[in-house]
Regions:
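Charged, low-complexity surface segments at secondary-structure and domain boundaries
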Residues: 8-12, 96-113, 121-129, 266-289, ...
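Long amphipathic alpha-helical segments
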Residues: 73, 78-96, 105-113, 257-267, ...
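Extended, helix-rich architectural segments
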Residues: 1-212, 216
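Acidic/proline-rich low-complexity IDRs
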Residues: 32, 299, 340-343
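A broad, structural surface signal
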Residues: 114-117, 121-132, 141-145, 149-152, ...
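Structured, contiguous alpha/beta core segments that scaffold functional sites
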Residues: 10-16, 20-22, 153-326
Length: 419
């Protein structure tokens, strides 16, 4: 039986709070867009990250690896995330510098750069001591599919900053008038008696407090929303709201002002014009991934037929297939002048299938940028060829890195500096 402790379809809003009505309207708009991407992302997750949370209902402990017969994409997406992390935000490395801009007078630049260098050193000291490296790897795995979301929150004196990679099934996005992401929803399921721990500044109505008292261990569907406010063009302002969808009540609302105020960082590998969600390298390789998976499945079926065999027999009334046991020492009765059991030759050729697999696996690795230095079993490349291959890789991913610079690196550093 599906494990669903909460309803998926929320009841229409029946209250008289215009804030909640506006919130739910925006949530439904984002949900409508999200529904068009569910099937595409779910298919990609099934073939590349089967252990991740599904976009649809599932049972507790459900096996999701039964469809995987070839692990090239599963391993490849892990390597893609690791290579991207090592190349863009290396662990314990200082992968960015703060320097004075053109608006600073020339005579003040050395002093400003000296101060900014100290700030840079402290920022990366905090990043190195936080959980950034663990969480950004999870986010980069989602990025291989197309879209990733990283939550950057203020911590305590021991851990000044907390990072959390939000699973894509829990996130809904929408574009603003400038065709940039300006609306982010995150769905959470929290026990009623833990709402105050999750949101210490929440304001609870008497009905909510009664629900917490009477049924505190029940799951509450909570949606966090962050919207950009365009009332003041020269200021960066966001509205942060938390709504309990089951009770249809807004328990928290506050305004976030300034650069780096938005705690959610949504970034994409690539996207088509006008679309909200991104398309990652896995999308380009899905045809090869599915073909490879199916080919290996057919090879295994053919191998099973070759090992155990398929047999034919003459229906002469003597042989009873229900009583035949194929094992050493078995005695099988046959009619006079009968051929008895005859092995059926296996169809298909393993060598042809291996040729297909070799090409498909190479395409998958190329799509995930795993073949930049060639195959290890081949002839070692010269330094010139290595340099040329790396130059070609830079041209291939240049546009994607430019997008990551504007959607991930810059907002991340602004958020960290603000905290």
């Amino acid at each position: 039986m599906p494990y669903m402790p909460y309803p998926q379809d929320d009841a229409p809003y029946s209250g008289n709070d215009p804030r909640v009505a506006s919130f739910i309207k925006k949530f439904r708009d984002a949900e409508y867009i999200f529904d068009h991407w569910k099937d595409k992302y779910e298919e990609a997750y099934e073939y590349t990250m089967p252990q991740r949370e599904s976009f649809y209902e599932e049972t507790i402990g459900e096996r999701r690896t039964d469809k995987i017969f070839d692990e090239t994409a599963v391993v490849g997406i892990q390597e893609f995330a690791s290579r991207l992390q090592a190349g863009m935000v290396p662990t314990y490395g200082r992968w960015a510098n703060f320097e004075a801009g053109s608006e600073i007078p020339d005579d003040a630049i050395p002093l400003v750069n000296e101060q900014l260098d100290a700030i840079t050193e402290y920022v990366f000291e905090v990043l190195g001591g936080s959980n950034f490296n663990q969480e950004v790897h999870e986010a980069f795995m989602d990025l291989a599919i197309g879209t990733a979301v990283l939550l950057v929150e203020e911590g305590d004196s021991l851990n000044p900053i907390n990072f959390q990679a939000i699973p894509l099934p829990r996130v809904m996005l929408n574009n603003g008038p400038d065709n940039k992401i300006d609306t982010i929803f995150r769905t959470r399921y929290i026990n009623y008696n833990r709402l105050m721990a999750a949101y210490p500044k929440a304001e609870m109505s008497p009905e909510m407090l009664k629900k917490i008292s009477d049924d505190g261990h029940a799951k509450a569907k909570v949606v966090e929303g962050v919207f950009k406010v365009y009332d003041k063009p020269n200021e960066e302002i966001y509205k942060y709201c938390v709504v309990c969808m089951d009770m249809q009540e807004m328990i928290l609302e506050k305004e976030l002002k300034g650069v780096g105020a938005n705690p959610y960082i949504a970034f994409r590998w690539n996207k088509a014009s006008g679309e909200v969600y991104g398309r990652g390298p896995v999308f380009n390789a899905m045809a090869a991934i599915k073909t490879t998976n199916l080919t290996v499945e057919l090879i295994l079926q053919n191998a099973q037929m070759s090992i155990s065999g398929i047999y034919t027999f003459e229906d002469d009334g003597v042989i009873n297939p229900e009583n035949i046991v194929l094992q050493p020492g078995s005695l099988i009765p046959v009619a006079p002048n009968s051929r008895g059991l005859q092995a059926l030759p296996a169809a298909g050729r393993f060598d042809v299938a291996q040729l297909i697999l070799g090409d498909m696996r190479a395409n998958i690795k190329k799509a995930l940028y795993m073949e930049t230095l060639g195959r290890p079993e081949g002839t070692p490349m010269s330094a010139t060829e290595v340099a040329e291959r790396m130059s070609d890789l830079s041209r291939q991913i240049g546009s994607s890195f430019g997008r990551l610079q504007s959607e991930f690196v810059t907002p991340l550093l602004r958020r960290v500096i603000r905290i």
